[in-house]
Amino acid sequence: MTHWTIVLATEAVEKTAEGGLFDFDATLPVMAIQFLVLAALLNKLFYKPIGQAIDDRSDYIRTNLVDAKERQQKAEDLAAQYEQELRDVRREAQDVIAKAQAEAQKVVADEVKSAQAEALAEREKAALEIEAQRESAFKSLEQQVDSLSQAIASKLVGAKL
């Protein structure tokens, strides 16, 4: 068995000694044609479909990015709109509270004013009643003083006679 390997090795060395680096015979153009056919087949079966898949994927990613940016912008707009509406509602609530407080203060002020007016009227009425009673008491006293002074005068005059 070793004999055959040695024989084959010597034959291979003898054949290479004849030619140089390349043999310019019919194999070179056949190899070039084979390479071109292989390149065309690879281009047709492998590179174009992969290139198309890459382009499709790139378009898909680009479209999704644009959609995502639009959705993000829409979400930001909605958030801003929500915050503006929330501020408006809070402002309206504060206005309603302020109006209610002002109205309550007005009602309290009206009630206090009414109570003060009523108390003043009662006081004036009481003062008038007191004045009327005083006048009547003075008249009564005056009548009693007159009658008593007449009685005293009659007793004094009657005692002198």
Swiss-Prot record:
Keyword Cell inner membrane attributed: no
Subcellular location: Cellular thylakoid membrane
Membrane topology, as annotated: Single-pass membrane protein
Disulfide partners: none
Keywords from the named record: ATP synthesis, CF(0), Hydrogen ion transport, Ion transport, Membrane, Thylakoid, Transmembrane, Transmembrane helix, Transport
Organism superkingdom: Bacteria
Molecular function GO terms recorded: proton-transporting ATP synthase activity, rotational mechanism; proton-transporting ATPase activity, rotational mechanism
InterPro entries: ATP_synth_b (IPR034679), ATP_synth_b/b'su_bac/chlpt (IPR002146), ATP_synth_F0_bsu_bac (IPR005864), ATP_synthase_B_chain (IPR050059)
Transmembrane annotation, as ranges: 30-47
Subunit record text: F-type ATPases have 2 components, F(1) - the catalytic core - and F(0) - the membrane proton channel. F(1) has five subunits: alpha(3), beta(3), gamma(1), delta(1), epsilon(1). F(0) has four main subunits: a(1), b(1), b'(1) and c(10-14). The alpha and beta chains form an alternating ring which encloses part of the gamma chain. F(1) is attached to F(0) by a central stalk formed by the gamma and epsilon chains, while a peripheral stalk is formed by the delta, b and b' chains.
Protein's job: F(1)F(0) ATP synthase produces ATP from ADP in the presence of a proton or sodium gradient. F-type ATPases consist of two structural domains, F(1) containing the extramembraneous catalytic core and F(0) containing the membrane proton channel, linked together by a central stalk and a peripheral stalk. During catalysis, ATP synthesis in the catalytic domain of F(1) is coupled via a rotary mechanism of the central stalk subunits to proton translocation. Component of the F(0) channel, it forms part of the peripheral stalk, linking F(1) to F(0). The b'-subunit is a diverged and duplicated form of b found in plants and photosynthetic bacteria.
Family: Belongs to the ATPase B chain family.
Protein name (record): ATP synthase subunit b'
Organism from which the protein derives: Picosynechococcus sp. (strain ATCC 27264 / PCC 7002 / PR-6) (Agmenellum quadruplicatum)
Upper classification of the organism: Bacteria, Bacillati, Cyanobacteriota, Cyanophyceae, Oscillatoriophycideae
